[in-house]
Amino acid sequence: MIVWLNGPFGVGKTAVAEALLDAKPDWLLLDPEERGVELLRTTPDAGDFQDLPAWRAGFVEDAVARNGSVDVVIPMTVRRLDYYREILDGMKSVVEVRPIRLTASETTLRERIARDDTPPTTAAWRLQHLDACIGAFDDAAFGDHIGTDGRTPAKIAALILVMIGRA
């Protein structure tokens, strides 16, 4: 099974993924952003790597290849519904996928980004693109919903494990 944690920047995807790995140490973590950064090194004029079909296809290939006999958790923001469906459909054609849509208030998102232990350029980029994310995940097509305001990553991970039948 693949558990895809999606949602706006600052919602806690990485922290929740880490909490899931704490609860399920045999699971694997996949960060599709790494492939995107690599692609941007060879195609610097691309802008956003999510616009590259090679990245979206690679996301699917990496996720399916890593799934094998263990569960995989993927913390990755994909707000464009067409890209999301392309990736999700590609994975679902091969393996069970449970998309989880994490949300939080704008105030919470901005506070978390400000507190996050990332380089200032990363925080600035996230804040610059946050407005485009706010409201983008209101569509139920993005998967099961969990609000993260006032919840710890461990609590959210526990909720996810119950939702997907892995508690």
Task: Provide a role label for each language-model segment.
Residues P8:
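P-loop (Walker A) phosphate-binding loop of NTP-binding proteins
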Residues D51-L102:
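Glycine-rich phosphate-binding loop used to anchor ATP phosphates in small-molecule kinases
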Residues R115-L159, A167:
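Small-molecule kinase domains that catalyze NTP-dependent phosphoryl transfer to phosphate-bearing small molecules
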Residues V11:
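ATP-binding Walker
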Residues A17-E61:
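Conserved substrate/cofactor phosphate-moiety recognition/catalytic segment
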Residues T14:
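Walker A/P-loop
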Residues E106-I113:
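Switch/connector loops and helix/strand junctions flanking conserved nucleotide-binding motifs
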Residues L5:
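Hydrophobic anchor at the beta1->P-loop junction of P-loop NTPases
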